[in-house]
Regions:
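N-terminal signal peptide c-region/cleavage motif recognized by signal peptidases
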Residues: 5-7
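Catalytic glycan-binding domains that act on GlcNAc-containing polysaccharides
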Residues: 9-157
């Protein structure tokens, strides 16, 4: 089990506030998406975890950024196409969004990951509700799945 220490949580909250100020996406929305996407548990409390991968539907939590990036790079080199790889706190899908990043390591960076997710949520909102944007973040073409996902994310705060 991995634990975000109090200083790390303070730093995480500062990062969320900074990204919220830059993008206009409410801090609570960003935090809810991060926590839902990369959740780990400590003392029964859900928390986000930065060194998280999801490969083919299987969540993996790593102790360090280096180990997570190395594992992801091996998966990408194995020749299976397309690799179903979600990266970092906000579980950005490499197949759909990887071309926006120089490397998996860059996408794994918490600031880059959260910043990209917040900008993506902002783009998805398109004058609609944050609930709609959150649902489209997960399932842009399946409204039933999108609503279920948004409900699960929003129930966390």
């Amino acid at each position: 089990m991995f634990i975000l220490s109090l200083p790390a949580m303070a730093s995480f909250n500062d990062l969320l506030e900074s990204v919220s100020d830059e993008t206009g996406v409410p801090t609570e929305i960003i935090k809810a998406v991060c926590t839902h996407e990369s959740q780990s548990y400590h003392n029964g409390k859900r928390q986000p975890w930065p060194w998280t991968l999801n490969i083919g539907g299987k969540g993996l939590w790593f102790k360090t950024k280096h180990s997570a990036v190395a594992y992801a790079e091996l998966e990408l080199m194995d020749g299976t196409e397309p690799v179903k790889l979600d990266v970092g706190m906000c579980q950005i899908n490499w197949y759909w969004h990887g071309n926006e990043f120089a490397s998996v390591g860059e996408l794994m960076d918490p600031r880059a990951n959260i910043q990209y997710a917040a900008n993506h949520l902002k783009d998805l909102k398109k004058g609609k509700s944050w609930e709609y944007a959150i649902g489209a973040y997960h399932s842009p073409s399946n409204q039933v799945r999108a609503k279920k996902y948004a409900s699960a994310v929003l129930s966390s705060f």
